UniProtKB/Swiss-Prot annotation:
The gene is xerC. Residues 106-285 form the Tyr recombinase domain. Keywords: Cell cycle, Cell division, Chromosome partition, Cytoplasm, DNA integration, DNA recombination, DNA-binding. It comes from Haemophilus influenzae (strain ATCC 51907 / DSM 11121 / KW20 / Rd). This is Tyrosine recombinase XerC. One of its GO terms (cellular component) is Holliday junction resolvase complex. One of its GO terms (molecular function) is DNA binding.
Length: 295
């Protein structure tokens, strides 16, 4: 079994020119697979059948592997067995048609209205706080991705008509409205922006005058959340998810939210309908006299 694996590593390294990191990941997964096979007294790849592949997955799950890691292990095994088929050592790939356990759908976390109010209730006049408040207000008001906000220039924003021009995924441009609170916060920021000695046309700059980095935004939001007494970790995703959830709760217009978020597929936006249903179910449970549903 090891001889075939060594030929496979050479194939990946020389012919496929895969990175050492990727090869190491494959090695880790297949080494673990061989250990499971050895426990079943399987010492030849020709002994591996579809039932054996399913056993490998079941045993790996029993050992504590999560869904994502199980999918990686199956993928590594399937690719290797496909190589053996190409080499004529196997007639068919026994892993073909076998799926790893589906990854559970993790609903994004969001803040409720009171938490948003708590987050933004800060009127500090420090220039860096004025900048951060503008970032927070704009992200929550428009649902921008972190990369979209970080890439904004001065000419991207129009506080008079309250619109921001965004370059999203796939280099697609869209225009997103924002509210009067965000507009006011941005105007306040523009009054003090020159104090940071900006070196380019970036809307949001660091204290060194450069375009603020992704990491700096993440750290500032985390710090702001702690300072405002939020119990949960604050990050750009949470602001975007909160925007989407609150928009759906207020309007139920999935297509409009899709456009605002810049999703190319409606299915991506539909995850927020699950969040919205959770909110409605909670209201129902609290309000209806016969609503005590079993959980």
């Amino acid at each position: 079994m090891l001889t075939a694996l060594n030929r496979y590593w050479d194939y990946l390294r020389i012919e496929r020119q895969m990175s050492p990191h990727t090869i190491t990941n494959y090695q880790h997964q297949l080494d673990a697979t061989i250990k499971i096979l050895a426990q079943q007294d399987i010492h030849s790849w020709t002994q591996v059948t579809p039932s054996v592949v399913r056993f490998i997955l079941a045993e790996s799950k029993k050992q504590g592997l999560k869904e994502k890691s199980l999918a990686l292990r199956l993928s590594a095994l399937r690719r290797f067995l496909s190589f053996l088929v190409q080499q004529g050592e196997l007639k068919v790939n026994p892993a073909t048609g076998i799926s790893a356990p589906k990854q559970g759908r993790h609903l994004p976390k969001n803040m409720d209205g009171e938490q948003v109010q708590q987050l933004l209730a800060n009127d500090s006049k420090e220039p860096i706080d004025i900048r951060d408040r503008a970032i927070l207000e704009l992200m929550y008001s428009s649902g921008l991705r972190l990369s979209e906000l970080q890439g904004l220039d001065l000419n991207s924003i129009n506080t008079r008509v309250r619109e921001v021009r965004v370059i999203g995924k796939g280099n697609k441009e869209r225009v997103v409205p924002f509210g009067r609170y965000a507009s006011h916060a941005i105007q306040e920021w523009l009054k003090v922006r020159a104090l940071f000695n900006p070196k380019d046309e970036a809307l949001f700059v660091s204290q060194l005058g450069n375009r603020i980095s992704h990491r700096a935004i993440q750290k500032r939001l985390e710090t702001w959340g702690i300072r405002q007494g939020l119990n949960s970790h604050l990050n750009p995703h949470k602001l975007r998810h909160s925007f989407a959830t609150h928009m759906l709760e207020a309007s139920s217009d999935l297509r409009a939210v899709q456009e605002l978020l810049g999703h190319s597929n409606l299915s991506t936006t539909q995850i927020y309908t699950h969040l919205n249903f959770q909110h409605l179910a909670e209201v129902y449970d609290q309000a209806h006299p016969r609503a005590k549903r079993k959980k």
